[in-house]
């Protein structure tokens, strides 16, 4: 790597904001001998351009010995970020490669067939006459032979050990703040009816937290998967369904072998946890947010030893990251707005802090253009939610009145909260401005909301990251709940039992900072963020030492706004001559609702004090979009001094 090339590799015709200083600091950090440079760059600083400059410093093939690594990888965990890179003319020399399922076959009778189910993977010995024109293999060949290959983090990790995508000189990871969590997610093994093709034929033992028993079961399951895969490989032709089964079996065998070998390795730093659901014939299990085991069959057999679907989770994925990331390059640049604590981040991902430098990029957006407003109405923990949610709904109406001609985003945190808020807002009579989404259509519903010129308000779930809502796409947002991790998750509970509360609050703060960056995307842009859950204010106090200076400045300026009195008709343009057309009544410049509000009306919950039955439109589309039911009712201790008071049952 030659860091002195960093300025000539900058792809834009000119610098803006702090980009030139950032490049200077990154160059100096690599020149000082650091193997890894963390770049903490806030929203709007042009991280992708900085990333391209670093990638361009990689050793070129013409200056390398045959054994030397050359070129660079650019990778990001977010598909939308990779889409943005692919569409950016300034980043045209980042050669994007995606997974096979993103490409379709070009054979005449297979135009709608994904490449991963095309004849070349269905038929043994198939010789494709147009492989040289296949969109997947064409993109792969280009990406593997050009100086910068761009891909998602999932694809990057899956190609570890590949002869096509070998070790390179430089690896750039964009949006790297969640690297440890992504690694834990990718390394997690789900064994249930959605992930094991012949699950119904299995007898699953009750593990009862016995890791050794889980390992023995996984060894046996890997053998069964291998036999089934070999049977499929022996066939001359496979159906698309059999192709999917074969590929899944191959993936599953790799996962199981990795778990068994890592567990048997006495030098491995990884701690493994095993969760098990009830079999389908046992006690009822609520519909979950993500695991694939709620409708599983415990398998044949009988007696009291039958168990249900298994989730096997790594606690410390350092070894996994070593193989999938750190062995893939010589030098690394990790970019994000929210790498909040260098030492903690390095510890999580298995890096030596002595070989890591942190470069801070200053924020260039005026703090007055990105205000935070305290409209807290109480706690949104499970035990307080039925009381607090109607108050937040009333407050949202008043915020809509404050922004009659501007689009807004509501961060609901869970589908249960989303549904309750949507029902209450419809009951209040402002449903004409409300949009929601479900799990299946979230991207389509988001794009439809972004495309409309109406001042609609979108109630979202888990959209705190990877959204670019510049300008009039969104002028205000409301955070309805502190985004604490779910304490019923065994991985979270294990860390909290070890006293890792700083990690817990830092993770929530990271999500809040990411959310705040959705609505202000340029120095002359502006947007307001309203905080409705009182636990958010407490979070700021607990995690203050991990705040970047530019976000601490926002928190220090936070006050309570003077919102209009509760009048739902005014929120939809039916009162006081307010029009729903864009331009009249809209706030056209940064600033705030003027100072304090005694909150006498928001404190009232005299109407619709429940979650609302909500017979309005949209209820059918939300019928399957409930949040995770959890595994019991671990409510807070009630003591305000206890960290548990604000966090139990956060996903419900």
Predicted segments with their positions:
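Conserved helicase motor
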Residues: 98-103, 153-155, 412-416, 433-447, ...
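Conserved RecA-like ASCE ATPase "motif II neighborhood" in helicase/translocase motors
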Residues: 127-169, 459-464
